[in-house]
């Protein structure tokens, strides 16, 4: 799993397969991410 930080809301989004689970209109607003177990 990977945590992305939303550059618009500054919220952390947990994702699988390097993609956030919640994608709006297939646009991903994520800057830096880090891996978690």
From Swiss-Prot:
Native organism taxonomy: Eukaryota, Discoba, Euglenozoa, Kinetoplastea, Metakinetoplastina
Subunit structure and binding partners: Monomer.
Family note: Belongs to the TCTP family.
Keyword check for Cytoplasm: yes
Name of the protein this chain belongs to: Translationally-controlled tumor protein homolog
Gene Ontology CC terms: cytoplasm
Alphabetical UniProt keywords: Calcium, Cytoplasm
Function of the protein: Binds calcium; exact function not known.
Domain of life where this protein originates: Eukaryota
Record-annotated disulphide pairs: none
Subcellular location: Cytoplasm
Keyword Membrane applies: no
InterPro entries to which the protein is assigned, alphabetical: Mss4-like_sf, TCTP, Translational_control_tumour_p
Residues of the TCTP domain: 1-37
């Amino acid at each position: 799993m990977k945590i992305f930080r939303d550059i618009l809301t500054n919220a952390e989004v947990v994702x699988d397969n390097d993609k956030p689970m919640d994608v709006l209109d297939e646009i991903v607003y994520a800057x830096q991410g880090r891996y978690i177990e």
